[in-house]
Design a protein with these regions (language model features):
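Conserved hydrophobic beta-strands of the Rossmann-like cofactor-binding core
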Residues: 7-10, 82-83
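Conserved glycine-rich cofactor-binding loop
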Residues: 14-16
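A glycine-rich helix->loop->beta "capping" turn
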Residues: 71-82, 90, 101
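The beta1-alpha1 cofactor-binding region of Rossmann-like NAD(H)/NADP(H)-dependent oxidoreductases
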Residues: 57-68, 99
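Substrate-binding pocket helix/loop in short-chain dehydrogenase/reductase
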Residues: 93-94, 101-106
């Protein structure tokens, strides 16, 4: 299989390190799809600047991940490369974090890896 036809999915792929990874994979000849969760304007600007399509869902939501993977594969082909890059922070010291903030961080940064990898596992 030619590298050009290989599909790479990058979570958190429209900003920061994720955007750099997405752009580098595209430059290396991969068909890249960038996932994002929140900032529609930033995702649109990224797509316009890079030519990389952006797809929206939260990696913290298992069902959204499973459905998102299905949509990506239906439109672009099988995902062969997954970069679990999505991550969030809640800028508070541990003793000042609320249980909700803690859960958001764990659901995205830890469970998100499972939520994205599981639907792609052969």
């Amino acid at each position: 299989m030619k590298k050009m036809s290989r599909v790479a999915l990058v979570t958190g792929g429209t900003r920061g390190i994720g955007a750099a990874i997405s752009i580098a994979l595209k430059a290396a000849g991969y068909r890249v799809i960038a996932n994002y969760a929140g900032n529609d304007a930033a995702a649109e600007a990224f797509t316009i600047a890079s030519g990389i399509p952006a797809v929206k869902w939260s990696v913290a939501d298992y069902n959204a991940c499973a459905e998102g993977v299905k949509r990506v594969e239906a439109q672009y082909g099988p995902v062969e490369i997954l970069v679990n890059n999505a991550g969030i922070t809640r800028d508070a010291m541990f003793h000042k974090m609320t249980p909700e903030q803690w859960r958001e961080v764990i659901d995205t940064n830890l469970s998100g890896v499972f939520n994205m990898t599981h639907p792609l596992w052969p």
